[in-house]
């Protein structure tokens, strides 16, 4: 039986590719997709979900827009990474269908309530929608199998010296998620910076030759430009968000550890930092499965294999 999932995302190039990977994988049943503000403004991220589902010919999947700002802060966006539309680069279709009239939290709650088995929530943007769901529907916690997030880092940040972007946008929401008691799987920068797509990989995807693999290659062409800056020291572009879906499909290509994670919400220099108790110094019981390494070639091969689904 396929694993039921809800995807909460803020497309974003890597979010879009995570959607492509999920919808090419029969092991997963995508029951709903919700959008969050983050990589771009909330109107643009919602539109990008609809554009991607139009491209992938999946108007059957319920879609709803989420919170327009973080729980306690003003919104920060990453237009310097993802461009004016949030998905700059390829020519994507205009949406062929409309989102549902309700909110992301309402759609998530309805999906959980109606599911015959616990649902995995995959969150590839700020955690605002997920935190609002957890706070407003404690009766549904048992219907959530786990929450798989792209966010955080044990080491260096990518938005501040200490913080990864998704967590930095809404650290209060992320703290709610980590301390919820629901199993959390964290794909942080420690692993996603190793999941780099090289120029040769982009050409491999392009050579698959179907319309979707071509779009993915064009998304990566644009995404690669930001990551060419020498300060990063990257060979390619780190494909953050698809690590969440790849872990669900092939956990064996990842190395993980069980650790306690908390989120700094007040530090002068460390707001948004995920504090990972790697050496068990706090006495707190582990609350997260933390990804620390990935077989990069296995990750690339999985993407290439699933892109052939769209032939």
Curated annotation (Swiss-Prot):
Q: Please cite one Gene Ontology biological process associated with this protein.
A: pyrimidine nucleobase metabolic process
Q: Which GO terms describe its cellular component?
A: cytosol
**Is Ribonucleoprotein given among the entry's keywords?**
no
Q: What is its EC number?
A: 3.2.-.-
Q: Where is the signal peptide?
A: none
GO molecular function terms listed in the Swiss-Prot or TrEMBL record = purine nucleosidase activity; uridine nucleosidase activity
Cited Pfam families: IU_nuc_hydro
EC top class, as a word:
hydrolase
**Keywords on this record?**
Glycosidase, Hydrolase
Listed SUPFAM superfamilies: Nucleoside hydrolase
Which residues carry out catalysis? 240
General function of this protein: Hydrolyzes cytidine or uridine to ribose and cytosine or uracil, respectively.
For this chain, the family text in UniProt reads: Belongs to the IUNH family. RihA subfamily.
HAMAP family from the UniProt entry: Pyrim_hydro_RihA (MF_01431)
> Protein name, please?
Pyrimidine-specific ribonucleoside hydrolase RihA
Query: Its encoding gene is what?
Result: rihA
């Amino acid at each position: 039986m396929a694993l039921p999932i809800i995807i909460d995302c803020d497309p974003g190039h890597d979010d879009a590719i995570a959607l492509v990977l999920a919808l090419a994988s029969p092991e997963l049943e995508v029951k709903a997709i919700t959008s969050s503000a983050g990589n771009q403004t909330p109107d643009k991220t919602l539109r990008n979900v609809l554009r991607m589902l139009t491209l992938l010919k999946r108007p059957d999947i319920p879609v709803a827009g989420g919170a327009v700002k973080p729980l306690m802060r003003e919104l920060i966006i990453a237009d310097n990474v993802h461009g004016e539309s949030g998905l700059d680069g390829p020519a994507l279709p205009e949406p062929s269908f409309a989102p549902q009239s309700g909110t992301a939290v309402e759609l998530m709650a309805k999906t959980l309530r109606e599911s015959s088995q616990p649902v995995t929530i995959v969150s590839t943007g700020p955690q605002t929608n997920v935190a609002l769901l957890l706070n407003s529907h404690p009766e549904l916690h048992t219907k959530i199998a786990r929450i798989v997030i792209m966010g955080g880092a044990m080491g260096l940040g990518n938005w501040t010296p200490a913080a990864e972007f998704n967590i930095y946008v809404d650290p209060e929401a992320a703290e709610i998620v980590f301390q919820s008691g629901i199993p959390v799987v964290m794909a942080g920068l420690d692993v996603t910076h190793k999941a780099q797509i090289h120029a040769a990989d982009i050409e491999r995807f392009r050579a698959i030759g179907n319309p979707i693999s071509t779009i993915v290659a064009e998304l990566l062409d644009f995404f690669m430009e930001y990551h060419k800056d020498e300060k990063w020291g990257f060979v390619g572009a780190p494909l953050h968000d698809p690590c969440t879906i790849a872990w669900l499909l092939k956990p064996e290509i990842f190395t993980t550890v069980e650790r306690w994670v908390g989120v700094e919400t007040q530090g002068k220099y460390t707001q948004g930092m995920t504090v990972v108790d790697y050496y068990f110094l706090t006495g707190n019981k582990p609350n997260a499965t933390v990804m620390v390494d990935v077989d990069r070639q296995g990750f690339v091969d999985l993407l290439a294999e699933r892109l052939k689904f769209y032939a």
